[in-house]
Amino acid sequence: MSRRCEICGKGPWTGLQVSHSHRRTKTRWLPNLHKVRALVNGKVKTIKVCTRCLKAGKVQKVV
């Protein structure tokens, strides 16, 4: 399963971490994902959603 938000499609970013001596190493920054039980097309489904979509109210959570 991918580390990607199923609502907005936000996924990992890649880049370089640069130390004080300017050595560079590849790294990945992962989105803040949560597994949420939500209504999708009238059915209850567990999906991965980023915090930004949760706070914006783009997901109808099931209790």
Swiss-Prot record:
Which SUPFAM superfamilies does the protein's record reference?
A: L28p-like (SSF143800)
Q: Where are the transmembrane segments?
A: none
Coiled-coil portions: none
**Superkingdom field:** Bacteria
Q: Which GO terms describe its molecular function?
A: structural constituent of ribosome
* Keywords carried by this UniProt record: Ribonucleoprotein, Ribosomal protein
Which protein family is it in? Belongs to the bacterial ribosomal protein bL28 family.
**Protein name as annotated:** Large ribosomal subunit protein bL28
Q: Which organism is it from?
A: Dictyoglomus turgidum (strain DSM 6724 / Z-1310)
What are the top taxonomic ranks of the organism?
Answer: Bacteria, Pseudomonadati, Dictyoglomota, Dictyoglomia, Dictyoglomales
